[in-house]
Amino acid sequence: IEILLGGDDGSLAFVPNNFTVASGEKITFKNNAGFPHNVVFDEDEIPSGVDSGKISMNEEDLLBAPGZVYZVZLTZKGSYSFYCSPHQGAGMVGKVTVN
């Protein structure tokens, strides 16, 4: 599944921002708009036992250019909340459910 970082209208959002994947399915987060974005999973909002550091980008790392991607595969079933650290305050957050 491909998730866009930034809406076509310039909004600071994940598109879609709520989605479901199968365990082990590849999730591709793709910079859509050229603003610097990243993908960080909230350590308090993921299944217990999952290491957020192993599935998140470093808070200092950013996808700067349109078309740059970050890929992750989640295997533990449950719900995972994530955000873009530069734009979390603007509401750039999302949730994925792994079945």
UniProtKB/Swiss-Prot annotation:
Q: Which Pfam families match?
A: Copper-bind
The subcellular location is: Plastid, Chloroplast thylakoid membrane
Its primary localisation, in coarse terms, equals plastid
Keyword set for this entry?
Chloroplast, Copper, Electron transport, Membrane, Metal-binding, Plastid, Thylakoid, Transport
**Superkingdom of the source species:** Eukaryota
Please report which protein family the annotation says this sequence is part of: Belongs to the plastocyanin family.
Relate the protein's function as given in its record. Answer: Participates in electron transfer between P700 and the cytochrome b6-f complex in photosystem I.
Q: What is this protein called?
A: Plastocyanin
Q: Which gene encodes it?
A: PETE
